[in-house]
Amino acid sequence: MSLEQVIKEIEQSQEIKKKEILENTKNILDKMEAEKKAKIDEIRALYQEKMRAESSRITASIIDKANIEARSILRNKIEEILEGYVSAAQEILRNIRNMPEYPALLNKMIEVAKKYLGQDCIIKVDSKDKAVAPSSGITYSNIDPYGGILASSRDGKVELDLRVSSIMEEVLEKIKVKIYTRLEE
């Protein structure tokens, strides 16, 4: 083999090696680029998922705060409305003694007390009702500004509070409980 052929073979061999090196380098770079893109996509997907989760958490927090505020506003409005009704009821109760039905109502309260606590029960009627209450077995004192009776069994173990203001408070409390229970549903 001549020197020229040897040089030519070496050059060809070098060209082949160069092509192989370039091909390998290109393959490595392509692989690195693909890995880089995959990693970027993975990071992007992870970031998007975190953003969705954070967005959902923030949205839920905002909705919860809005619900709490709405309930508070609703409760305040209900309280305001109830106060209006209570004021109106108190105005009516201030004049209940002047109503023609009051003597019958008072006598009915006394009948109920005697029925449930016994004929010998102790009944207290407000002093202002002395004129409309039967006098036998009745004690008079300042028990309620609106009227009604307080009764107890002879031994004092059982009491019956039929004062007008107590009845009104009890009814109002029951109404509030029902309203607030419905609000929580």
Swiss-Prot record:
GO terms for cellular component: plasma membrane; proton-transporting two-sector ATPase complex, catalytic domain. It is a peripheral membrane protein. Its main location: membrane. It is found in: Cell membrane. Keywords: ATP synthesis, Cell membrane, Hydrogen ion transport, Ion transport, Membrane, Transport. GO terms for molecular function: ATP binding; proton-transporting ATP synthase activity, rotational mechanism; proton-transporting ATPase activity, rotational mechanism. GO terms for biological process: proton motive force-driven plasma membrane ATP synthesis. InterPro entries: ATPase_E_C, ATPase_V1_Esu. NCBIfam families: PRK01194.1. Component of the A-type ATP synthase that produces ATP from ADP in the presence of a proton gradient across the membrane. Belongs to the V-ATPase E subunit family. Has multiple subunits with at least A(3), B(3), C, D, E, F, H, I and proteolipid K(x). This is A-type ATP synthase subunit E. The lineage of its organism: Archaea, Methanobacteriati, Thermoplasmatota, Thermoplasmata, Thermoplasmatales.
